Swiss-Prot record:
Single GO biological process annotation from the record: translation
Gene Ontology terms, MF aspect: structural constituent of ribosome; tRNA binding
PANTHER family: 30S RIBOSOMAL PROTEIN S10 FAMILY MEMBER (PTHR11700)
Name of the protein described by the UniProt record: Small ribosomal subunit protein uS10
Gene3D superfamilies reported for this sequence: Ribosomal protein S10 domain
A Gene Ontology cellular-component term: ribonucleoprotein complex
SUPFAM superfamilies in alphabetical order: Ribosomal protein S10
Entry keyword set: Ribonucleoprotein, Ribosomal protein
Record's keyword annotation contains Ribonucleoprotein: yes
Its job: Involved in the binding of tRNA to the ribosomes.
Phylogenetic classification of the source organism: Bacteria, Bacillati, Cyanobacteriota, Cyanophyceae, Synechococcales
Length: 105
């Protein structure tokens, strides 16, 4: 029995600012639609929350602490049946510096 393997591109995006992440996702989906590919997403993944506990005083008073947190927002976009035009358009796409992108073929 022959299985139909469909080619897809999986794009994982990470950012500290969710607004930058959403605008980047919109640009990628719009580019994929213009080149007649089929985008699925953006699919939101769980936000990672990293807490840092720091002493306020430089030498004493261990009871006084300050907490900082960093939130990492993540999204996945799948692009099915991409053409060479789709890949070229995605390579030329200008995205903000605060967004980390991983592409898997």
């Amino acid at each position: 029995m022959a299985t139909l393997t469909q080619q897809k591109i999986r794009i994982r995006l990470k950012a500290y600012d969710h607004r930058l992440l959403d605008t980047s996702c919109d640009k990628i989906v719009d580019t994929a639609r213009r080149t007649e590919a089929v985008p699925v997403g953006p699919i939101p993944l769980p936000t990672r929350r990293r807490l840092y506990c720091v002493l306020r005083s430089p030498h004493t008073d261990k009871d006084s602490r300050e907490h900082f947190e960093v939130r990492t927002h993540r999204r996945i976009i799948d692009i099915y049946s991409p053409s060479s035009k789709t890949i070229d358009a995605l390579m030329k796409l200008d995205l903000p510096a605060g967004v980390d992108i991983e592409v898997k073929l």
